[in-house]
């Protein structure tokens, strides 16, 4: 099971290799496992946040662009994607839904200027073996004041891996607008964890 493999991996170079080998089947697997994040994002953007279609969006940890297809269907067109896997980005590029794609790790300083995105989405990324809580500060840095950061965080790592603490540390920069009820991210995969969707708003 690819899911078990990637979430138990501790080496970033091996993780990159796993995604290289998984890239061509990723969308098929996500679809068959009932990937919940696209639906969750659709609900947030349709019911909770009524944002202009022209806003500048960052899809952080975009992978193949599977979740960003929701943005495209909702007529958001100004989307930048970042991912550390060139193979996943090749799939994303073929969908022609991104204005710009960048290959880099979110665990490092992001090569983008501060305060430029009105919306950042980050789903299925802030979890074990992938991107740690230290990335939150960098993502908030490139978010515009009054901009929104929508992310999913697995229940199993929220406290244990320091995400709760890091969000508290950012209290002078962001406020928590809402936290969803816990849901199973991949209902048709026995190795899937429960997650919640967090909406943070940048203060200044």
Language-model-derived ranges and their functions:
Residues 1-24:
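N-terminal, positively charged/glycine-rich alpha-helical extensions of SAM-dependent methyltransferases
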Residues 146-154:
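Conserved beta-strand signature within the Rossmann-like core of class I S-adenosyl-L-methionine
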Residues 27-43:
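Conserved SAM-binding loop and adjacent beta-strand
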Residues 162-182:
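Conserved Class I S-adenosyl-L-methionine
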Residues 187-204:
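Core SAM-dependent methyltransferase catalytic element
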Residues 134-145:
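A short glycine-rich, Lys/Arg-flanked "PGG" loop and its adjoining helix->strand segment in the class I
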Residues 58-109:
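Class I SAM-dependent methyltransferase SAM/SAH-binding core
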Residues 110-120:
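A short acidic, Gly/Pro-enriched loop at the edge of an enzyme's catalytic core
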